Amino acid sequence: TTMTDILKPVFNSMRKGNVRYSKGGLNPTGASCVITDEMGNDKLIGKCHRAVWYSKTGVPRTNLPDDQTFIKFAVGHAMEDNFQTHWNRMGVLIEGNIPLREDISNGDPRGELIISGEVDGLLRDFEMNEEGEITRISSTKAIGMEMKTNRGFFAKKEVYGIGNKRYPTGHPKMDHVMQTALYLRMRWKLEEYYGVEIDSFRIVYCQVDDGLTTYFDISLSDGYSGEVIIKDRNGDRIQPDALASLEAGLDLKRIGGLTIENIMDRYYMMQDYLQDVENPPPRNYQLRYDEETFEKKLAAGEISKTGAANWEKKPLAQVGDWQCRYCDWKNHCLPYGVLTEKVEAGLLTEEAALGQLGIVGFGS
């Protein structure tokens, strides 16, 4: 007799997730924005419009996470619940997992713009002693909360600043910053309902493999609009380290253009793309960088030595944007991998592309 595999149904349940019903509208996780990076170049950050289009038009995902990834997700959820338990025990948690659905257009001539998401938590502001014992809880001020877990060497460097010359106190992930900025835009709903004033949100990070934690403070420059302001846990506005600029011989500036208005522009574009349910919008990222992008990224120090060597030596190496590499619709969008655009442009037949990729068709 075969032994009952008691784990298999767990993964099946994880894959299915909770019953998902669309609350309508676009989601904060789908945010994107064109910013000016530290070098002064325009740079797109956030979700690819085509990926959002696939999601909203119901195109089935072709590249689902594996079992290990589901375990990583589960660890993340467990950490969120754990932190909430402690904030609750200390008497400062107003509420956790608060659904928000709001028209954020605020009279924009382009019409309504419905965004729906879920805020991880809302805490009452408080005072405490050296030990962290709470001495006073505010009845009027509150802090919004986004919880994120991560793991691995790159997160340690980027988010926590370990061995990071450019940002020694770390830097939050831009996708998380934009998501949080949208909750700040919509926060009047929370303020009204809970009778509090919310000046900022915190993104709390927990590195599950090493137990590191940190947080960043996110606020808007002009009430519910304007520039998105990112501060580290010391309360200092984040900008590239002056010494790192000098050492690199670069004049590194604080990133610009990260505003509610610019984020909204991309959402309005997305809304227009969704009027056409037959034709997906253009790809925003590259599975393999073209020559021009490669040179730019190399100069900006955004490509590792290994990556650069692979790009130069291996014409099929997927040295490009992580947004394509880890996309849920990768095989649907790029059926011929890095050769897809050549096939689409008629420069390569499907058979030739498959041959180069080492996939031999039947009967040949």
Regions found by a protein language model. Give the residues of each.
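Short beta-strand-loop-alpha-helix junction that forms the active-site gateway
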Residues: 147-170
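Short, charged, amphipathic alpha-helix that recurs within catalytic cores of restriction-modification
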Residues: 162-189
